[in-house]
């Protein structure tokens, strides 16, 4: 059995297979998954698992060099914005419109659907390198 933080098999496979520059989307329950992008659905019920819990878990496993967040998040969901700022630390964050975030999502290797049912709880993580 795995001993590290990330236990979900499908998500572990995706993270382990990501290369430098690959994109991973973590989204709320309502974020659409573009055609051709692998969906990893973690949602059990509204709020479970929470978006920030999933982000924190993935950040423990994935080297991230940059992130993309919708600019609407700061205004419409300040708690998520504050949580992302805390979790991402010094990772550079680009803000785009929610529509642009959905367009960029089409280039992701996977989209992780959480049980989060608050607006604009979405982030795109760009994989970095550990050396």
Swiss-Prot record:
Which Pfam family, just one, is annotated for this protein? Answer: RbsD_FucU
* Catalytic activities: beta-D-ribopyranose = beta-D-ribofuranose
Keyword set, alphabetical order: Carbohydrate metabolism, Cytoplasm, Isomerase
Q: InterPro entries in the record, alphabetically?
A: D-ribose_pyranase, RbsD-like_sf, RbsD_FucU
Pathway entry: Carbohydrate metabolism; D-ribose degradation; D-ribose 5-phosphate from beta-D-ribopyranose: step 1/2
Where is the protein found, in the record's own terms?
A: Cytoplasm
Q: Which HAMAP family would you find in this protein's record? A: D_rib_pyranase
User: What do we know about how this protein assembles, alone or with others?
Assistant: Homodecamer.
Which protein, by its recorded name, is this? D-ribose pyranase
Organism per entry: Symbiobacterium thermophilum (strain DSM 24528 / JCM 14929 / IAM 14863 / T)
């Amino acid at each position: 059995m795995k001993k590290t933080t990330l236990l979900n098999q499908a998500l572990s496979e995706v993270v382990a297979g990501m290369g430098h520059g690959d994109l991973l989307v973590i989204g709320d329950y309502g974020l659409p998954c573009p055609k051709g992008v692998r969906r990893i659905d973690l949602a059990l019920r509204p709020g479970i698992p929470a978006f920030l819990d999933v982000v924190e878990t993935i950040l423990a496993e994935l080297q991230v060099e940059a992130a993309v967040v919708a600019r609407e998040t700061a205004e419409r969901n300040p708690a998520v914005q504050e949580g992302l700022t805390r979790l991402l630390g010094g990772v550079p964050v680009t803000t785009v419109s929610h529509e642009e975030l959905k367009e960029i999502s089409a280039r992701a290797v996977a989209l992780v659907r959480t049980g989060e049912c608050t607006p604009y709880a979405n982030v795109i993580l760009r994989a970095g390198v550990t050396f």
